[in-house]
Swiss-Prot record:
Protein name: Golgi apparatus membrane protein TVP18
SMART domains: Cg6151-P
Signal peptide region: none
Gene (UniProt): TVP18
Keywords: Glycoprotein, Golgi apparatus, Membrane, Transmembrane, Transmembrane helix
InterPro entries xref list: TVP18/Ca-channel_flower (IPR019365)
Similarity comment: family membership: Belongs to the TVP18 family.
Superkingdom per UniProt: Eukaryota
Positions annotated as glycosylated: 24
Example GO biological process: vesicle-mediated transport
Membrane topology per record: Multi-pass membrane protein
Amino acid sequence: MAFSIQSIFSNIFSGLSADFKKKNFSLYGQWVGIISILLCLALGVANIFHASIVIVFSIICIVQGLVVTLVEMPFLLKICPFTETFTNFIKNFDANWPRCGFYLLNAAIQWVSIAVMATSLIVVACFFTVAGGCYALAAITHQEYLKSSIQVTGSPDSVEGQIGQHVVRNVL
């Protein structure tokens, strides 16, 4: 019952396609948020080698990437041991308006880094702004808050998908 890389990528891209067909801005915001996680970690580390106060913004960017990871992938809260206070704080962002504010606050912090020096952290600020904008559009148009429907294990109707879901359920 080994999952092939091809079947995993096929399931991811079919789930991504299904998400975009729903035309819900909260799903778009979630995907932009997931991309911003990778950008935060990569560009935060890349900019940490500046010999100026940009180092502070780089460290903040890395921390933002880790917090956004927990906001966008809440199953990690069950796996990693966190205090109940921190877990409840992260769970506050389970609606469109709170996520909009969260992303726009993160964007504002990274936009301030331009005052020190123009670096590649501008890309992170842009992605945070776009994610915040997507969640704002979802809230303004009264779209319900949705989470991505990607299932790496396959469709629930297939035997492979049912076994994969059972394994994941037992782990969590």
